Amino acid sequence: MWEARAEYADGSTVERYFSERPGIEEAEQQYLLECWLLDRHPDCTWYSVNYINE
């Protein structure tokens, strides 16, 4: 499972969990989630993407 979190300049935050997607390597999955966080809002001030062992 993946955890994606971000904070934005206007004070809004997002925290969401994602299941693993078969056939996608770990680095690619992390990159896709980072892009998702950055595309949600133009002024991202902080973000984190972590893999969580269940």
Protein language model features and the residues they cover:
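A structural detector for beta-sheet-dominated domains
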Residues: 7, 19, 50-52
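Amphipathic alpha-helical segments in structured regions that serve as interaction surfaces
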Residues: 27-33
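A general secondary-structure boundary signal
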Residues: 4, 13-14, 36
